[in-house]
């Protein structure tokens, strides 16, 4: 069984929550709960409210996601 492709979409950080989780408002108006990917955590990239980010969302659960990139 093949793994489903994840959806990549851009959004803006609305709120910083505990445990490196963030509330992200996506381009389409949806708000998702997203955690930071391992590479971003490994390189100590700071993510603050107001930052524009790229989020990966699973097609199975569109309420949760993973932050994969922070735009400069």
Curated annotation (Swiss-Prot):
GO cellular component terms, semicolon-separated: cytosol
* Domain S1-like residue range list: 1-72
Which CDD domains would you find in this protein's record? Answer: S1_IF1 (cd04451)
Entry keywords, A to Z: Cytoplasm, Initiation factor, Protein biosynthesis, RNA-binding, rRNA-binding
What does the record list as coiled-coil region(s)? none
Q: Where in the cell is it found?
A: Cytoplasm
Example of a GO MF term: ribosome binding
Which Gene3D superfamilies does the UniProt record give? Nucleic acid-binding proteins (2.40.50.140)
Q: Which SUPFAM superfamilies match?
A: Nucleic acid-binding proteins (SSF50249)
A Pfam family hit: eIF-1a
What the entry lists under SMART domains is as follows: S1
| Chief location | cytoplasm
What InterPro entries does the record point to? NA-bd_OB-fold (IPR012340), RNA-binding_domain_S1_IF1 (IPR006196), S1_domain (IPR003029), TIF_IF1 (IPR004368)
**What's this chain's function?**
One of the essential components for the initiation of protein synthesis. Stabilizes the binding of IF-2 and IF-3 on the 30S subunit to which N-formylmethionyl-tRNA(fMet) subsequently binds. Helps modulate mRNA selection, yielding the 30S pre-initiation complex (PIC). Upon addition of the 50S ribosomal subunit IF-1, IF-2 and IF-3 are released leaving the mature 70S translation initiation complex.
Question: Quaternary structure?
Answer: Component of the 30S ribosomal translation pre-initiation complex which assembles on the 30S ribosome in the order IF-2 and IF-3, IF-1 and N-formylmethionyl-tRNA(fMet); mRNA recruitment can occur at any time during PIC assembly.
Which family is it part of?
Answer: Belongs to the IF-1 family.
Its protein name is: Translation initiation factor IF-1
Q: Which organism is it from?
A: Chlorobium chlorochromatii (strain CaD3)
* Gene label: infA
């Amino acid at each position: 069984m093949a793994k489903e492709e994840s959806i990549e979409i851009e959004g803006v950080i609305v709120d910083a929550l505990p445990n490196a989780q963030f509330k992200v408002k996506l381009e389409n108006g949806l708000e998702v709960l997203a955690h930071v990917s391992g590479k971003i955590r490994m390189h100590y990239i700071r993510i603050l409210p107001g930052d524009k980010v790229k989020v990966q969302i699973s097609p199975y659960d569109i309420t949760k996601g993973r932050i994969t990139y922070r735009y400069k």
